[in-house]
């Protein structure tokens, strides 16, 4: 604490002395006055610290000193970065907490990536993200930190920023310093970036990603636009990752009722259903009005509030009183309940742990915060949201098309259990966006199943599905809430892996499937490269696993035909299976399927060598069999000259068989190479196909609410509108209003 006081007093004394000298000499010489003015500005600019002054010692963070593997503890930096031109840390400034992986597990592309994470609100602290979601740490009920195995810091350096000013540990000098519009917030974030890269110049050349969730769906596109429109700060911005984004408040509000009907939260028979439809109609009328350039309408915001009110359960089906903390649906996770009217505001359950952590003596000082200068940590600040009304800004959905056309990758990932920013609403916004000469996802949209592979047992778990078209990716994350990394931290890293092109593309049950896992597989990474050629079945399990074999046996799929086919294959595979318990599924032929092989060069040569070795082995075995036959012949039956004649005949036969085997092997290998070389070249960006046109969806009218009431049954039992494309059999589309879950994955 004395450090802060001493440093600030010193700065004030120096500034006062410089001002006195400036006043004295300005009467004598203009050049001297200018010189002192420059000295004064230099002195003031010295308030910007060096990087090592922001270093955070793990030993000062409760719990980290007891970490079992200290090598996994990341390098950390934290503190205030001022925003004003004079770098005065006692006016408006942003608080940041940066994590850098030191375990060596990050791939080459990951080591060259810098992620800025922003939470929403507006006015909610990004310490939510740092300590409950994608950050390197989690906090237990005792207020102590422990390592988050699913932290995104292994996919790139990640910086959590409290913004706008007044959020979390970021400060303002007075109420006049609160921002009232997204354009102003964007200017301040660019100022933060300018000073950040001065403090950390080594980060200046890295590819930059803006990531976040919820209201960050507004912040991130606006910040990206501001970065592209200025040339003061050189930022190598490459991608925007937005989780459950609030990108078009009005349009997304129209999908609360359809989503609630689809999920069974309310039915058309409910007495309150017509009341909700009336609110829906009011919102639609506002959108269709001349005021449609407004950022948001109160009539649209009311829909969710009314939905939560009418679905409140005070008594259960037996007439018993429902506990007060179970009466309302959690708007952030429909699987959970909360008290009314909180309806999710008391969630996540880890939230109280953060207050206990930041309240622990010494933690603020460890993060280079002055306890006399910052207030007690609060998750969200009402003043920030009350001031930020955006009178001069439109919703960010109007900005996204230009960013896509500028070449930025935009990835919208959505937890499928969220209500407030649900899948249906986000996909509806996409369907109305126009970019690259098309509207919405085109007919050439690329569709993928998405699974996660456990590093412990290689078990495959369905993670979601992916759509890509013209730089825009939509990812639905199964069994995830509004805060995807909170529920599924390990799975959520697949969002970054997809951007880094660090995924496997395989076929599972004839469907194009992206596999993400816990290991970085980048070309320049230290982690070993996993084999992409694995053919998976048995509900996503490795074909050669014991569990899969038992499953096949129970289904009658592992009968004599498979056995005979296996005996005709490479006998060395069987030996390896016995010794290792399992082997790459690509070595096994199943029902005539060919080995999926991605490695063209060395592996092809190796296959030819294996074929030749097998041929030699077969030839030697045949020689031994012939020798045995000769040796078993009774001596009395050998005629004169017959033995020499048989030897000559056998020698010629052996040579002919050898030549035929080599010729056939070479023909097969050559055919396989030219057939499959394009398919199994080294990994390509799986999501890079240009689109074709799709007709624009007709604009809804005020009659849509009545249509919804009349056709509500269609929402509960949608027709199969699945798009069949290549190996796909049942892929959801926006038109189908399906459950957004792929059956039988």
UniProtKB/Swiss-Prot annotation:
Family matches, as Gene3D superfamilies: alpha/beta hydrolase
Membrane topology: Single-pass type I membrane protein
EC main group: hydrolase
Any one of the GO BP annotations: proteolysis
Compositionally biased residues, Acidic residues: 527-537, 570-579, 587-629
Record's subcellular location: Golgi apparatus, trans-Golgi network membrane
Listed GO CC annotations: membrane; trans-Golgi network
Region described as Disordered: 515-651, 709-745
Chain ranges passing through the membrane: 656-676
Lumenal side: 48-655
GO molecular function: serine-type carboxypeptidase activity
UniProt-listed InterPro entries: AB_hydrolase_fold, Peptidase_S10
Signal sequence extent: 1-47
Pfam families attached to this UniProt entry: Peptidase_S10
Glycosylation sites: 471, 479, 552
Catalytic reaction list: Preferential release of a C-terminal arginine or lysine residue
Cysteine disulfide partners in this protein: none
Record topological domains on the Cytoplasmic side: 677-745
Superkingdom of origin: Eukaryota
EC number: 3.4.16.6
Keyword annotations from UniProtKB, A to Z: Apoptosis, Carboxypeptidase, Glycoprotein, Golgi apparatus, Hydrolase, Membrane, Protease, Signal, Transmembrane, Transmembrane helix
Location, primary (coarse class): Golgi
Residues at the active site: 214, 418, 482
Summary of the function given for this chain in its UniProt record: Protease with a carboxypeptidase B-like function involved in the C-terminal processing of the lysine and arginine residues from protein precursors. Promotes cell fusion and is involved in the programmed cell death.
Entry's family note: Belongs to the peptidase S10 family.
Protein name as it appears in the record: Pheromone-processing carboxypeptidase KEX1
Organism from which the protein derives: Lachancea thermotolerans (strain ATCC 56472 / CBS 6340 / NRRL Y-8284)
Gene label: KEX1
């Amino acid at each position: 604490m004395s450090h802060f006081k001493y440093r600030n007093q010193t700065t004030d004394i120096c500034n006062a002395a410089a001002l006195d000298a400036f006043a004295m000499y300005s009467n004598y010489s203009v050049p001297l006055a200018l010189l002192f003015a420059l000295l004064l500005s230099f002195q003031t600019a010295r308030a910007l610290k060096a990087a090592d002054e922001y270093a955070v010692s793990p030993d000062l963070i409760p719990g980290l000193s007891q970490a079992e593997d200290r090598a996994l503890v990341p390098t950390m930096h934290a503190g205030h970065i001022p925003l004003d031109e004079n770098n005065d840390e006692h006016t408006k400034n942003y608080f940041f907490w940066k994590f850098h992986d030191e375990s060596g597990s990050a791939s080459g592309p990951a080591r060259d990536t810098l992620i800025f994470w922003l939470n929403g609100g507006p006015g909610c602290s990004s310490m939510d993200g740092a300590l409950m979601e994608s950050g390197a740490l989690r906090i237990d009920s005792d207020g102590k930190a422990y390592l988050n195995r699913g932290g995104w810091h292994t996919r790139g350096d990640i910086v959590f920023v409290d913004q706008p000013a007044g959020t979390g540990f970021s400060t303002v000098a007075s109420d006049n310093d609160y921002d009232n519009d997204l354009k102003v917030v964007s200017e301040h974030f660019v100022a933060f970036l300018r000073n950040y890269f001065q403090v950390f110049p080594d980060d200046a050349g890295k590819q930059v990603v803006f990531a976040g969730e919820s209201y960050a769906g507004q912040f991130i596109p606006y910040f990206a636009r501001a970065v592209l429109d200025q040339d003061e700060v050189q930022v190598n911005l490459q991608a925007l990752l937005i989780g459950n984004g609030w990108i078009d408040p009005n349009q997304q509000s129209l999908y609360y009722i359809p989503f609630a009907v689809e999920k069974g939260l309310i039915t058309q028979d409910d007495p309150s259903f017509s009341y909700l439809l009336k609110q829906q109609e009011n919102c639609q009328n506002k959108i269709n009005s001349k005021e449609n350039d407004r950022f948001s309408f109160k009539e649209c915001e009311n829909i969710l509030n009314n939905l939560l009110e009418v679905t409140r359960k005070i008594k259960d089906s037996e007439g018993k009183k429902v506990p007060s903390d179970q009466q309302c649906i959690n708007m952030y996770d429909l699987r959970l309940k909360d008290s009314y009217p909180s309806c999710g505001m008391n969630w996540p359950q880890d939230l109280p742990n953060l207050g206990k952590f930041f309240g622990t003596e010494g933690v603020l000082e460890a993060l280079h915060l002055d306890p006399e200068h910052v207030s007690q940590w609060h998750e969200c600040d009402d003043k920030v949201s009350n001031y930020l009304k955006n009178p001069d800004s439109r919703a960010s959905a109007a900005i996204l098309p230009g960013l896509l056309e500028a070449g930025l990758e935009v990835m919208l990932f959505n937890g499928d259990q969220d209500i407030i920013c649900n899948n249906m609403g986000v996909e509806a916004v996409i369907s109305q966006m126009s970019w690259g000469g098309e509207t919405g996802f085109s007919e050439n949209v690329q569709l993928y199943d998405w699974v996660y592979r456990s590093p412990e047992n290689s078990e495959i778990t369905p993670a979601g599905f992916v759509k890509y078209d013209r730089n825009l990716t939509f990812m639905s994350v199964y069994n995830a809430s509004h805060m995807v990394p909170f529920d599924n931290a390990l799975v959520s890293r697949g969002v970054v892996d997809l951007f880094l092109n660090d995924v496997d593309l395989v076929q599972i049950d004839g469907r194009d499937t992206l596999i993400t896992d816990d290991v970085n597989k980048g070309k320049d990474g230290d982690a070993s490269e996993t084999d992409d050629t694995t053919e998976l079945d048995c509900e996503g399990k490795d074909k050669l696993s014991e569990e899969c074999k038992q499953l096949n046996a129970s289904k009658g799929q592992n009968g004599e035909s498979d056995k005979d086919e296996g005996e005709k294959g490479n006998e060395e595979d069987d030996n390896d299976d016995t010794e290792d318990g399992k082997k790459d599924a690509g070595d096994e032929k199943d029902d005539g399927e060919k080995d999926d092989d991605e490695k063209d060069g060395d592996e092809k040569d190796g296959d030819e060598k294996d074929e030749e070795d097998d041929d030699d082995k077969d030839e030697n075995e045949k020689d031994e069999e012939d020798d045995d036959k000769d040796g078993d012949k009774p001596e009395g039956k050998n005629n004169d000259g017959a033995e020499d004649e048989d030897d000559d005949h056998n020698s010629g036969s052996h040579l002919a068989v050898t030549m035929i085997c080599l010729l056939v092997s070479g023909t097969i290998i050559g055919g396989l190479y030219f057939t499959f070389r394009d398919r199994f070249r080294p990994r390509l960006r799986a999501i890079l196909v240009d689109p074709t046109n799709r007709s624009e969806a007709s604009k809804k009218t005020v009659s849509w609410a009545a249509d919804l009431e009349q056709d509500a049954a269609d929402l509960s039992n949608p027709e199969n509108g699945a798009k069949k494309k290549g190996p796909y059999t049942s892929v959801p589309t926006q038109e189908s209003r399906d459950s957004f879950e792929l059956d039988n994955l």
